[in-house]
């Protein structure tokens, strides 16, 4: 299994990097674009043996996106989780990978859960 990591930054992009052991270097495998301003945080969800990869990204634009890749080296698909109306600072997955915590500029932490049909619902909030 290849080593990969995800980064974000002030270029409004999320980048997936893959380690090339033969070259002893990291190469950009994919560039994901959906945010209209700085991407503040990214988090890779545990896949628990499933053949799917899931990443959450959040940004200065107030949006959180869920990115999915259903097969190795396949295309990444994005879905907007929510527009928070204020910068979003952090995203963090549960160990099972089906619950996402989001911290935004309204001084609120919201908890979101993915349902069986793939929709995301807010299940909790704390200010």
Locations of regions flagged by a protein language model:
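WD40-repeat beta-propellers
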Residues: 14-19, 42, 64-69, 109-114
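Beta-strand initiation motifs
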Residues: 22-28, 72-78, 117-123
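Residue-level recognition of a conserved intra-blade site in WD40 beta-propeller repeats
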Residues: 44, 48-49, 93
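Conserved strand-to-loop turn within each blade of WD40 beta-propeller repeats
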Residues: 7-11, 57-61, 102-106
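Structural hallmark of WD40 beta-propellers
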Residues: 1-6, 49-56, 66, 97-101
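WD40/WD-repeat beta-propeller blade N-cap
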Residues: 32-39, 80-88, 126-127
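Blade-level signature of beta-propeller repeat domains, shared across WD40, Kelch, NHL, RCC1
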Residues: 94-126
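Structural signature of WD-repeat beta-propeller blades
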Residues: 3, 40-43, 53, 89
């Amino acid at each position: 299994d290849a080593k990969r990591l995800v980064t974000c930054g002030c270029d409004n992009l999320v980048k997936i990097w893959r380690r090339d052991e033969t070259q002893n270097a990291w190469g950009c495998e994919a560039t994901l674009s959906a945010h209209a301003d700085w991407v503040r945080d990214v988090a890779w969800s545990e896949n628990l043996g499933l053949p799917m990869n899931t990443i959450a990204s959040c940004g200065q634009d107030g949006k959180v996106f869920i990115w999915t890749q259903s097969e190795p080296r396949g295309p990444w698909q994005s879905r907007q989780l929510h527009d928070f109306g204020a910068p979003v600072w952090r995203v963090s997955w549960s160990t099972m990978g089906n619950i996402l915590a989001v911290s935004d500029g309204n001084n609120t932490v919201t908890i979101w859960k993915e349902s069986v049909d793939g929709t995301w619902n807010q299940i909790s909030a704390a200010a």
